[in-house]
């Protein structure tokens, strides 16, 4: 493809991929959506390299490495079937999101499995899927959204604290709310501009300083006073 390179078993392509062009176009779109979300296109920073999606024969389900994203052999039917791929696109988008994480400004300590999911959710919904935050929380009667909002607003739990009551998907909610709110306010470029600020400003020395700097840069990118949101 133009942006993606697939290394999957030939027999899986033969069994699941009647239209190879349509499949690679979907992978290309995944990669492009994440690059656009980060402002790489807006700020003329597009990566000329392809993102490699490769089958792996080990115990890892899916992962992101230095030069590829890997997917266990048991996922190959899904990865080669365009309908299944689009419905399950969270996983590949999550791994590409890891490759795109910008440290430490948007990936300070404790956010390794959180901020990449801003990308996952953006890609998931851009492909027309329902938001994963609307799924029921671990089979309960309430959604991930409801669980997180209860933890942060009713119980007033610190965002950084993760335990059996709050997980990475709950921690994703405030980041996604920033996207939804700024978009509703007419700012389509919030995260594009935020990523550029992170890329061009000096890194902070500690995770705590990085977290505080994020609030400052978010206000700057949104061109709004978001103090109440962060307190």
Predicted feature locations:
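Catalytic cores of extracellular degradative/oxidative enzymes
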Residues: 2-181
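Active-site-proximal alpha-helical
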Residues: 143-231
């Amino acid at each position: 493809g133009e942006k993606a390179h697939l290394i999957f078993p030939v027999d899986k392509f033969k069994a699941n991929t009647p239209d190879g062009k349509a499949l690679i176009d979907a992978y290309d779109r995944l990669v492009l959506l994440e690059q656009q979300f980060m402002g790489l296109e807006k700020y003329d920073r597009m990566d000329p390299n392809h993102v490699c999606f490769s089958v792996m024969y080990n115990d890892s389900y899916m992962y992101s490495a230095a030069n590829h994203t890997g997917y266990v052999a048991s996922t190959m039917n899904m990865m080669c079937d365009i309908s299944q791929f689009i419905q399950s696109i969270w996983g590949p988008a999550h791994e590409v999101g890891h490759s795109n994480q910008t440290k430490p400004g948007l990936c300070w300590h404790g956010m390794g499995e959180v901020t990449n999911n801003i990308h996952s959710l953006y890609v998931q919904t851009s492909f027309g899927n329902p938001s994963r935050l609307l799924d029921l929380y671990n089979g309960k009667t309430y959604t991930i959204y409801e669980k997180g909002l209860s933890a942060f607003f009713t119980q007033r739990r610190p965002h950084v604290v993760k335990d059996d009551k709050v997980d990475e998907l709950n921690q994703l909610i405030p980041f996604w709310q920033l996207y939804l709110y700024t978009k509703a306010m007419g700012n389509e470029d919030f995260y594009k501009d935020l990523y550029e600020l992170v890329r061009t400003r000096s890194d902070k020395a500690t995770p705590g300083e990085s977290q505080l700097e994020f609030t400052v840069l978010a206000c700057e990118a949104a061109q709004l006073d978001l103090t109440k949101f962060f307190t």
